[in-house]
Amino acid sequence: MQNSSYIGRFAPTPSGYLHFGSLVAALASYLDARSVGGRWLLRMEDLDPPREAPGAQSAILQTLERYGLHWDGELVRQSDRHGEYEALLQRLFDQGLAYACTCSRKQLEGSGGIYPGHCRNAGHARHDAAIRLRVPELIYRFSDRVQGEYSQHLGREVGDFVIRRRDGLYAYQLAVVLDDAWQGINNVVRGADLLDSTPRQLYLQELLGFSQPRYLHVPLIIQPDGHKLGKSYRSPPLPGDQATALLIRALRALGQSAPDELADASAEELLAWSARQWNAALIPRTRNLAESQLR
């Protein structure tokens, strides 16, 4: 079925080069969009300059092109949207939905990652403070297309969460919700490491009156040492001369398969065939997938 209203996206962070785990997520989002004639947008989530690796942005773009993952429209960089984030932050602050927090990491030790609310009613000034969003004592539920039903009690399991850091950098949760709405994203396909973030995003979308996308979280690729493939663990970058072979391997990770005769095809030919055959129902219904299973 063709659905020209489908708008998906891939949103890498330039803290390092793309690796095989990145490819699995990018491929899933690309094929899910292309299989129904939808649009696939690219957004660079460059919110944290101190963590950005030199040359990573250009390397990411080159890798996507070499692997045939051509996006629609212009690249969006979050670093160009600070004015929009600040306007939203001020709106939430003015409505009493956000507040300044001066808690140090030491003060929050022992809280298990759940903010205990020390500054909730303190009335601190915004200067030299993080900004937190008040959360309700409610359970947020959603149905993920692969992971199934998921629920989270925001008050008990998360607590009031940061939407701008103390150093002035905007937090992922704020930026991703605003940018998805601004770009008209109605289908989010990404790694299962972000499953736990989704209820926070649903709550913020609800507060702001934004439409809520459909979500699909694909399994993370786990290395033999138990760590996920990721930039934090120095996973090897995708080589430029093995696009077709690694795309076929990524298809296997997503429960899809390609005939042997496509082993010598170009990346574009393989992707065109894969988009016609794409079936999201075949994606393994697990959060983690051992890399050793894909060899």
Which residues fall in each region the model found?
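Non-catalytic terminal extensions that flank enzyme cores
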Residues: M1-S15, D128, L138, H227-R295
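Noncatalytic linker/hinge segments flanking ATPase motor cores
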Residues: H19, R81-E86, Q173-L174, L178, ...
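Active-site cores that bind ATP or allylic diphosphates and position pyrophosphate for catalysis
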Residues: A100, R105-G240, A258, L294-R295
